[in-house]
Amino acid sequence: MQAEELYVALNSSEATEAGLDLMFNGDSNGSGGFADASLNGTSKIIGSKTAASTLAGSATTKAKFDNMIIDFATNVVPNWGSDAGVGQAGAISSPDGASTYHINAQGQEIDQLFFKGLIGAFTLDQIVNNYIHPNQLDSGSRIDDNDNDVLSGDNNYTDMEHKWDEGFGYLLSLIHI
């Protein structure tokens, strides 16, 4: 899954801005930069679905994710082997020494901010503002078609059922992250 590979990359001292950006935003060929070749060249691009609704603030939100990629690649990665300090990116250990965290100069662990931010900017935005929004569910003849069990093409579901299934698919995908 693309998100899993991007998470691994945001925990790697080998990550580059170009590589992370390709995984998040894709390029003219679609998705790219993933070790699993089946994830490359698709129209499924994490960045294109992040803060993708037309609500005010969406562009600002998307830019925050792009800036986190830049921060990680230009500040965290170069200081991977250094100890973090006040105003200094680097590594910090848990109190018991069992875990090491790589933080930016503000003490933020970018991978955690990035992926917890995606819960809202990607998952919630897709569910609420795209799939189960009244503009989707109530558009055209969907209400009547659903009430009268009019199936979508050759499928065994109505258009409205499909929108609900897509929305919950985004929610349940969080189980794998």
Region roles according to the model:
Residues 1-175:
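Mature extracytoplasmic or organellar-lumen-exposed domains after removal of signal/transit peptides
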